[in-house]
C-alpha cells in the first residue's frame, strides 16, 4: 500500500515551519496514543505512521531530501540518501516521540528528564504554607499589624540544615547515581520514577543528625508579625517570602501565604468598596420627612435627611463613607436603605386615631395601593367575562 504524504499525516502544509510541524505531531500523538484508543485497532498503526513522518520532517536534511524525492529518498533506492536504505528502526521511532515527550508530559513528570549530567542536588526547597487569618470589618477598613503563630518546619539548629552530624558528608546514591530518579524502558516510552533508595534526594546521609534524623529540619512554632493593609477583603492573599517550611538539607525555605477572611458585620454589608446599611424609620418620619442619624465604619456618625413620602427600600448614598481601595487612593460609598417600620402594640386610643386617619385618606395618599387594587378589579372583571 502506498505511503501517505508525511505532511498530510501530521495535518500541516508543505510550507509549515518547524514549530508547526512539532505542534502537528503533538496533536496527532495525543489523539492517536494507544492508551487512549484501546478500542481502535487502527490507532496504533496511525500512531507509528505519525512518528515516522515526524522523524523525517523534524530533521532539516531528511526534510530537504523528502521534499525533493518523496518517499523514494528513504526506501533504499536513492544512493547517498540520508538513510542509505533499510527503513526506519525502533531507535528513531522512539527518538521522534522522545523529542515531544517532555512537552506532552513534562509538567506531570516535574519538568525533569533525568538526562546524564543532570544529577540532583541534595538541597530541596521547602514547601509553601497557608495561614487563614480572620479579621473584623473595622480592621479591614483601618489596616493593622497582627502577631500570628505559625507551626512549621525550621532548619535544624544542631546540623544547620545539612542533615548530617558534624563533619559527616553525604554520599551519592548508588541506586540512581545521584540523579534522584530511576528510569525504566516500557516499549517506546521511558518512564521516570523517584528513586526508592534516596527518596529523590540524589544523596544518602550515612551519619544522620541525631536531632532531625537527617531531614535537616525540625518542627517548631514561629511568631511572625503580619502587616494587613487597609482595604483587604475575604480572599485577599498576602505573600511572605521565605517564611514557609525550611528546605531539606540546606535548601531555601518556601513562602508563607496569608489568606484573609473578613468577618460579617452586625450593621454593614460589603460589596467591594461599597457598604450597605439598613436603617429603620418610623411611619411618621417616612411620611412627613425628617433627619436620622446613621453610623459609619470609621466610628463616626452622619446626619441623613429622609425625604417626605419615603417608602421602604429607598436608598440614599453617602459619598466617601465606604471602604478604602486596597491599592491606591479613594474610598467607596455607603448606601442607606430605609425600612419603614409599622407600629405595633398600639393602645386603644392609638388604634382609633389610625382608623380616623385611614378614613380621611384619599387615593392620592396611597397611590401604590390604589393602583394595585384597580389592577386586581380589572383582572377579576376579565375572569368573569
UniProtKB/Swiss-Prot annotation:
Tell me the keywords, alphabetical order.
Answer: Chaperone, Cytoplasm, DNA replication, Metal-binding, Repeat, Stress response, Zinc, Zinc-finger
Give me the CXXCXGXG motif repeat coordinates as residue ranges. 156-163, 173-180, 195-202, 209-216
Where in this chain does the record put each J domain?
Answer: 5-70
Q: Which residues cross the membrane?
A: none
Q: Does the keyword Repeat apply?
A: yes
Residues in CR-type zinc fingers run 143-221
What task does this protein carry out?
A: Participates actively in the response to hyperosmotic and heat shock by preventing the aggregation of stress-denatured proteins and by disaggregating proteins, also in an autonomous, DnaK-independent fashion. Unfolded proteins bind initially to DnaJ; upon interaction with the DnaJ-bound protein, DnaK hydrolyzes its bound ATP, resulting in the formation of a stable complex. GrpE releases ADP from DnaK; ATP binding to DnaK triggers the release of the substrate protein, thus completing the reaction cycle.
Give the protein family.
Belongs to the DnaJ family.
From the Swiss-Prot or TrEMBL record, give the protein name: Chaperone protein DnaJ
**Organism, as annotated:** Jannaschia sp. (strain CCS1)
Amino acid at each position: 500500500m502506498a505511503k501517505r504524504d508525511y505532511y498530510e499525516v501530521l495535518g500541516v502544509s508543505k510550507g509549515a515551519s518547524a514549530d508547526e510541524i512539532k505542534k502537528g505531531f503533538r496533536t496527532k500523538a495525543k489523539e492517536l496514543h494507544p492508551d487512549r484508543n484501546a478500542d481502535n485497532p487502527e490507532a496504533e498503526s496511525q500512531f507509528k505512521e505519525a512518528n515516522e513522518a515526524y522523524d523525517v520532517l523534524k530533521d532539516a536534511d531528511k526534510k530537504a531530501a523528502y521534499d525533493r524525492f518523496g518517499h523514494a529518498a528513504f526506501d533504499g533506492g536513492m544512493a547517498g540518501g540520508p538513510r542509505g536504505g533499510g527503513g526506519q528502526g525502533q531507535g528513531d521511532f522512539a527518538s521522534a516521540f522522545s523529542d515531544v515527550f517532555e512537552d506532552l508530559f513534562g509538567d506531570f513528570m516535574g519538568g525533569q528528564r533525568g538526562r546524564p549530567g543532570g544529577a540532583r542536588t541534595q538541597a530541596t526547597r521547602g514547601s509553601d504554607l497557608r495561614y487563614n487569618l480572620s479579621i473584623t470589618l473595622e480592621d479591614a477598613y483601618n489596616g493593622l499589624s497582627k502577631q500570628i503563630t505559625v507551626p512549621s518546619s525550621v532548619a535544624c539548629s544542631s546540623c544547620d540544615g545539612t542533615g548530617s552530624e558534624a563533619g559527616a558528608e553525604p554520599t551519592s546514591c548508588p541506586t540512581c547515581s545521584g540523579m534522584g530518579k530511576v528510569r525504566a524502558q516500557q516499549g517506546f516510552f521511558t518512564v521516570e520514577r523517584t528513586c526508592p533508595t534516596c527518596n529523590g534526594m540524589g544523596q544518602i546521609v550515612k551519619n544522620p543528625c541525631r536531632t532531625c534524623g537527617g531531614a535537616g529540619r525540625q518542627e517548631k512554632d514561629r511568631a511572625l508579625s503580619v502587616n494587613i493593609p487597609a482595604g483587604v477583603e475575604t480572599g485577599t492573599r498576602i505573600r511572605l517570602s521565605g517564611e514557609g517550611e525550611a528546605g531539606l538539607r540546606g535548601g531555601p525555605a518556601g513562602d508563607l501565604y496569608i489568606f484573609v477572611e473578613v468577618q460579617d458585620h452586625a450593621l454593614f454589608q460589603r460589596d467591594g468598596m461599597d457598604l450597605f446599611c439598613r436603617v429603620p424609620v418610623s411611619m411618621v418620619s417616612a411620611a412627613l420627612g425628617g433627619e436620622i442619624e446613621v453610623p459609619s465604619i470609621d466610628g463616626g456618625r452622619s446626619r441623613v435627611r429622609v425625604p417626605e413620602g419615603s417608602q421602604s427600600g429607598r436608598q440614599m448614598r453617602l459619598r466617601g463613607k465606604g471602604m478604602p481601595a486596597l491599592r491606591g487612593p479613594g474610598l467607596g460609598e455607603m448606601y442607606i436603605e430605609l425600612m419603614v417600620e409599622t407600629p405595633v402594640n398600639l393602645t386603644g386610643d392609638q388604634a382609633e386615631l389610625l382608623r380616623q386617619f385611614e378614613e380621611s385618606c384619599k387615593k392620592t395618599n396611597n397611590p401604590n395601593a390604589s393602583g394595585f387594587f384597580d389592577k386586581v378589579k380589572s383582572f377579576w372583571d376579565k375572569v368573569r367575562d
